[in-house]
């Protein structure tokens, strides 16, 4: 495992200097899910939630979040993102009705977009919670992680499908 890059020789936090790194095509895919009551999933699926189109609003929130990641995470570089896409799948895993969110983020730049993909997923899922909390305060956001990343010196990463 390599050393932490966000600390200088004195142990002080700093933003990593990426000026000498080449701009390469970078892609990151992250996912997560929100578990809920069956009635809540039915509201989302039917489009009858009081606050409107839950997944449409969550998609826009996730896109906005990816673009604002460097404002939220102190040592992240501001990046010119070339693509942010969010997909939602409604499913039942065991006895847990859920919405699974997957975000794909791309750029051509000197640093990766994993944080942007993770932020997009988290904020999209938080938006679902916000829009449905009046009917289901027991929703649970879980399993947020990077599925894959490509580009840069460290190459590709694929999460273990077994978890």
Curated annotation (Swiss-Prot):
<protein>
    <recommendedName>
        <fullName>Cyclic pyranopterin monophosphate synthase</fullName>
        <ecNumber>4.6.1.17</ecNumber>
    </recommendedName>
</protein>
<dbReference type="InterPro" id="IPR047594">
    <property type="entry name" value="MoaC_bact/euk"/>
</dbReference>
<dbReference type="InterPro" id="IPR036522">
    <property type="entry name" value="MoaC_sf"/>
</dbReference>
<dbReference type="InterPro" id="IPR023045">
    <property type="entry name" value="MoaC"/>
</dbReference>
<dbReference type="Pfam" id="PF01967">
    <property type="entry name" value="MoaC"/>
</dbReference>
<comment type="similarity">
    <text>Belongs to the MoaC family.</text>
</comment>
<comment type="pathway">
    <text>Cofactor biosynthesis; molybdopterin biosynthesis.</text>
</comment>
<keyword id="KW-0501">Molybdenum cofactor biosynthesis</keyword>
<dbReference type="GO" id="GO:0006777">
    <property type="term" value="P:Mo-molybdopterin cofactor biosynthetic process"/>
</dbReference>
<dbReference type="InterPro" id="IPR002820">
    <property type="entry name" value="Mopterin_CF_biosynth-C_dom"/>
</dbReference>
<feature type="binding site">
    <location>
        <begin position="115"/>
        <end position="116"/>
    </location>
    <ligand>
        <name>substrate</name>
    </ligand>
</feature>
<comment type="function">
    <text>Catalyzes the conversion of (8S)-3',8-cyclo-7,8-dihydroguanosine 5'-triphosphate to cyclic pyranopterin monophosphate (cPMP).</text>
</comment>
<feature type="binding site">
    <location>
        <begin position="75"/>
        <end position="77"/>
    </location>
    <ligand>
        <name>substrate</name>
    </ligand>
</feature>
<dbReference type="GO" id="GO:0061799">
    <property type="term" value="F:cyclic pyranopterin monophosphate synthase activity"/>
</dbReference>
<keyword id="KW-0456">Lyase</keyword>
<dbReference type="InterPro" id="IPR050105">
    <property type="entry name" value="MoCo_biosynth_MoaA/MoaC"/>
</dbReference>
<comment type="subunit">
    <text>Homohexamer; trimer of dimers.</text>
</comment>
<feature type="active site">
    <location>
        <position position="130"/>
    </location>
</feature>
């Amino acid at each position: 495992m390599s050393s932490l890059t966000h600390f200088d020789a004195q142990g002080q936090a700093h933003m990593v200097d990426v000026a000498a790194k080449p701009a390469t095509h970078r892609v990151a895919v992250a996912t997560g899910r929100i578990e809920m009551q069956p009635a809540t999933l039915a509201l989302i699926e039917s489009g009858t939630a009081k606050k409107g189109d839950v997944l449409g609003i969550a998609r826009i929130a996730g896109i906005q979040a990816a673009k604002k990641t460097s404002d939220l995470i102190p040592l992240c570089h501001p990046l010119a993102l070339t693509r942010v896409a969010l997909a939602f799948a409604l499913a039942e895993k065991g006895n847990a009705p859920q919405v699974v969110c997957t975000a794909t983020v791309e750029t051509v730049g000197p640093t990766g977009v994993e944080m942007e993909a993770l932020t997009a997923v988290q904020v999209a899922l938080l938006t679902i919670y916000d829009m449905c909390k009046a009917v289901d305060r027991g929703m649970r956001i879980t399993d947020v992680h990077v599925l894959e990343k490509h580009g840069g010196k460290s190459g590709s990463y694929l999460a273990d499908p077994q978890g």
